């Protein structure tokens, strides 16, 4: 017979999960749904950066806080910081100039024109993966050096703005005259999970330059900002690096002149660090132990800092005055003959074989070195087109200074959107084409004007579907990443947007609205287009038995064609727009994932996505006037029919062909085809999260709520680019 003691021992040996204290029951622990279903639709991307993660609360206004900042005092403190060398991370030549320029560059340099994501606008360098990228080694120290300044000024200056301003001050302190600085970057409080950094699983995997043109990636290797400084795949060949350089800088919207200026300007100051082999360097900040307090890459070589520092593994100092602006980069590039050598860490670099020792040692004034350069620096001499520009800058330092000032400004402000978002005393007056400039408003419609225009639009013979389609086509180009696109400017009427196939269904309505604008002669076409959507929604709601006034904020203006860079606006052409049941060039990305991507660009939540798709299907707003997803026999009525019929078990769905892109919904009893749908429709019944929202709107008590929610989400999209009223 067993005793209580025996029973206790048996339970202990079996490790009863209820009382042993070693079960991983912490929040978020254990196997997740994504472990079981790795291709699960990422609806959670639409919940990023909510107020629940913002410690500053709903009432915080960054623009107001910045207006109370002593800007001159801040810049003075940054200038003092540059030469306040800290023993835990000693400054090269007693100055953090190069370090802060690199921090600013790498903060901004993740931007990609293709999808507008990345860039400096959110202060993402604080978070993974960027805080631990191989190309960002030691920038954790730069951010810690900045902390006393950030701590002093608190929320009057965001981290995102501070990173860039610190780089500007570093340049100015070196004797360079910058083009200006615009603040207005608001911090977020968690990593951007929507950015596709690539599919590679290992750091520094090589990408062919041609592949970069087919994906919104900004670097030739996973974990780099731009290109491998040792040449493609560590080739050591300067000439072969030219395609990669053009591809990566081109993905940011930089031309050859801007590219040369940025490379040379960025390498006029500071140095790289490669005192010893990389095996001395510890884990990155995200992998570091808790006592490291967010710092990574601890080095076991010597002191691990100062003269013993290891970052890229390259040991290069470009110029004789690494803390003072000069034209020595180009002078050295063309004056000397360069031979391939290796750094103490074993990285491929070049040394000026016929040069005297003219480069000062960063910590021992009695020592000098020969000039050294990166493999990719020499590309500026050995690529024919880059060489022409480089020689011009060699012979005309002022042209170089002007080109770098403008290119640096573009680099660091590229993802900020229109100049209306810029704040601060150093914003340049000049409008630049990459800012998508708009003319000043010359007339503000009165309420009487608005009422008159609404009546004229309503009597113009346009259907609800046409009114909705033209307004959506105008507003839905907005991208939350770089704040480009949107209805303001009425660029729907300009090249290239007027010629996009996705906008073909808006052509008749656009022509009608242009005629109304010519007769009105006061209101902008941009306002009239949005007002057309207002009329359409109000008509559709009334037809559904709900009287509602759709909010409308006048004040938009009309851009000119010469204010519109056609090539840059081509990036705004949607690859897919599930709200209109549009999908362009086929890819391996599922249609429903592209729908989530589009909603994320429009800063929509999952409920907003759901109500908008359901409403637009009821209003017949498909780009090609197809019946896909139009689960109603009363098109143009703002009804919940889409949800009711999608969730109705009378229908079963089958793909029409092997692509499984289009489906037929058949009556289970008769076999009759009742509806057709795309993946962008059926996902609201198949995905468990989206279905939960669809069930709300399919309920019998949801009709009025649906109309109100649709109006709110619709108005949000129409005003996404109205930074003047936000």
Swiss-Prot record:
Chemical reaction(s) catalysed: H2O2 + AH2 = A + 2 H2O; 2 H2O2 = O2 + 2 H2O
Species of origin reads Cronobacter sakazakii (strain ATCC BAA-894) (Enterobacter sakazakii)
Self-association state and partner proteins as the record states? Homodimer or homotetramer.
Tell me the Gene Ontology biological-process terms attached to this UniProt entry. cellular response to hydrogen peroxide; hydrogen peroxide catabolic process
What does the record say about how the cofactor binds? Binds 1 heme b (iron(II)-protoporphyrin IX) group per dimer.
The job of this chain, per UniProt, is described as: Bifunctional enzyme with both catalase and broad-spectrum peroxidase activity.
- Higher taxonomy: Bacteria, Pseudomonadati, Pseudomonadota, Gammaproteobacteria, Enterobacterales
Q: Where is this cross-link: Tryptophyl-tyrosyl-methioninium (Tyr-Met) (with W-105)?
A: 226-252
Give the protein name, as stated in the record: Catalase-peroxidase
Gene Ontology, cellular component aspect = cytosol
Q: Which GO terms describe its molecular function?
A: catalase activity; heme binding; metal ion binding
Q: Which InterPro entries match?
A: Catalase_peroxidase, Haem_peroxidase, Haem_peroxidase_sf, Peroxidases_AS, Peroxidases_heam-ligand_BS
**What's the Enzyme Commission number for this chain?**
1.11.1.21
Post-translational modification (record): Formation of the three residue Trp-Tyr-Met cross-link is important for the catalase, but not the peroxidase activity of the enzyme.
Where does the signal sequence lie?
none
Q: So which cofactors does this thing need?
A: heme b
Crosslink feature (Tryptophyl-tyrosyl-methioninium (Trp-Tyr) (with M-252)) location: 105-226
* Stretches the record annotates as Disordered: 1-34
Q: Which UniProt keywords apply?
A: Heme, Hydrogen peroxide, Iron, Metal-binding, Oxidoreductase, Peroxidase
Where composition is biased (Polar residues), the residues are 1-12
Q: Specify one Pfam family.
A: peroxidase
